[in-house]
Amino acid sequence: MSPEKAATSDDAVLGGRLVLRQPLRGHRVGHDAILLAAATVAQSGDHAVDLGAGVGGAGLALARRIAGVAVTLVEIDPVLAALAAANAERNNLSDRVRALRLDVEASAADFAAAGLAPGSAACVLMNPPFNVLQQPSPDHARRLAHAASATTLEQWLRTAARLLRADGVVTLIWRADGLAEVLAALDRDFGAITVLPVHPKPGAAAIRVLVRATKGNRAPLALLPGFLLADADGKPTAAAEAILRGGEALSLTGN
């Protein structure tokens, strides 16, 4: 379906700091994308790459938070890639944010031809597909966003390692019950791993993990105290509100 014919909605995120046009069906921008952007460290002049960017939620949130960061949104789905480009334009970020229709698992030559040479990124952020293929969504767009093979995570992290400069950092969000998969996939190229569990409320098991790792660094892993999205009554915590609506950064340093 063409971007012009796709049924979409215009949704404000970050307390209205961004307005995103996105399909009514399929994967939609939610807490995961905003948490991922908030946990990504970058500074003015850096080049960040958002792998599997969808309509650009995480990458655009990063660009909104940090002035001067250049962001490339990589997305395989043509409708979503077109929406990502349009969202950069409508939020007045197209001078620093561009969208590419490209498979994250494409070759180094394909990435270079698109202007993404090895070692060209200071940071990579990603929200990889995490549903096993035995349980795919019947919706095609949602299936592209969520369905994973046994090697998806490893392949995405290899792409990240190739794109990153020597001291570059990858940040990702993943299912909490898949943390072992993340650590195994990071082992080849990354170290100095920091893990932040994300809990829906006090006493509940983590539903997500935010993970940051540095290319070529072999420092030991750090497991941080969990981050709470809501209190026992279901009300968003002040920390969650500051990030999800206020656009603040989410520290993964343990401070």
What are these regions (language model features)?
Residues 1-14, 47, 110-118, 249-255:
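Short, low-complexity, intrinsically disordered N-terminal peptides in bacterial proteins
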Residues 25, 150-206:
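Conserved Class I SAM-dependent methyltransferase catalytic core
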Residues 36, 156, 213:
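Residue-level signal for inorganic ion chemistry
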